[in-house]
């Protein structure tokens, strides 16, 4: 797997400046940008759309979108729209990536989100979204997701399948395993020890084996905190 370098954007800078950062990152060969959406600050879909229209090659992903804030069909429609907006990379891959998370406390309970059974809720959301990305009509009956003959009803745009990679912002062992089992991979956390990362990758591998895949086939982007200075 080729070494890559990306950026993780939150809301630390003026929006116009962050768009300039994205253009600079693309010019310098960065592979991707992940836009945060865990706080009630900047909406990742709005920011991702802006980043996509101000760049032409770099990949843009959500890092990560809480599954409790939107219906999975709406999530699929939003990412399908960004897929059309962005076009493909020079290698023919989707420029847009979908990172999903189970949100966190206390913000979730403060807005009335019911985070029970996050593992099951995550599985159902990903299965439904992945099915909708085929552009076929689907029905899904789960505890958290119910879809009755639903499809991405694109009338004038491309109806090609949306080969959009899906990631989980996973921290615990079971969610890490799920990311290896049904996703393109996890988005690994930052400000953690190397021992934690080694164990996390081991959990991802357990999940990958359940679906008959090798760990080498699982993408594993990791967030890193760093401080830059003009001084040597």
Regions found by a protein language model. Give the residues of each.
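Glycine-/proline-rich flexible loop or hinge segments
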Residues: 31-34, 58-67, 107-111
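Active-site pocket-lining/capping segments in soluble small-molecule metabolic enzymes
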Residues: 232
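Hydrophobic faces of well-ordered beta-strands that scaffold small-molecule active sites
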Residues: 5-9, 33-35, 60-63, 96-100, ...
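Active-site-proximal loop/turn and secondary-structure-junction residues that shape catalytic pockets
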Residues: 11-13, 39, 66-68, 102-106, ...
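Conserved strand-to-helix beginnings and helix N-cap segments that scaffold or border functional pockets
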Residues: 18-19, 45, 72-76, 198
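Active-site mouth loops of central-metabolism enzymes
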Residues: 3-16, 65-72, 161-171, 226-229
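N-terminal beta1-alpha1-beta2 module of alpha/beta enzyme domains
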Residues: 1-60, 164
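Internal, glycine-rich beta/alpha segment that forms the wall or movable "lid"
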Residues: 74-185, 190-218
């Amino acid at each position: 797997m080729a070494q890559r370098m990306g950026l993780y954007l939150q809301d630390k800078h003026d929006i116009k400046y962050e768009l300039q950062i994205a253009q600079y990152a693309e010019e310098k060969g960065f592979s991707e940008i992940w836009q945060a959406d865990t706080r009630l600050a900047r909406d990742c879909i709005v920011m991702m759309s802006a980043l996509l229209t101000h760049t032409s090659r770099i990949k843009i992903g959500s890092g990560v979108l809480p599954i409790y804030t939107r219906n999975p069909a709406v999530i699929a429609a939003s990412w399908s729209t960004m897929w059309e907006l962005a076009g493909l990379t020079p290698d023919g891959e989707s420029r847009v990536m979908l990172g999903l998370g189970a949100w966190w406390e206390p913000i979730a309970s403060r807005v009335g989100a019911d985070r029970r059974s996050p593992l099951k809720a995550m599985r159902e959301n990903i299965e439904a979204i992945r099915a909708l990305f085929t552009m076929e009509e689907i029905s899904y009956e789960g505890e958290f997701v119910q879809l009755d003959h639903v499809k991405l009803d694109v009338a004038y745009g491309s109806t090609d399948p949306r080969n959009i990679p899906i990631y989980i912002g996973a921290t615990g062992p079971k969610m890490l395993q799920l990311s290896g089992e049904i996703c393109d991979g996890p988005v690994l956390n930052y400000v953690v020890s190397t021992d934690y990362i080694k164990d996390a990758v081991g959990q991802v591998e357990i999940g990958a084996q359940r679906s008959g895949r090798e760990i080498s086939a699982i993408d594993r982007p990791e967030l890193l905190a760093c401080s830059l200075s003009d001084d040597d």
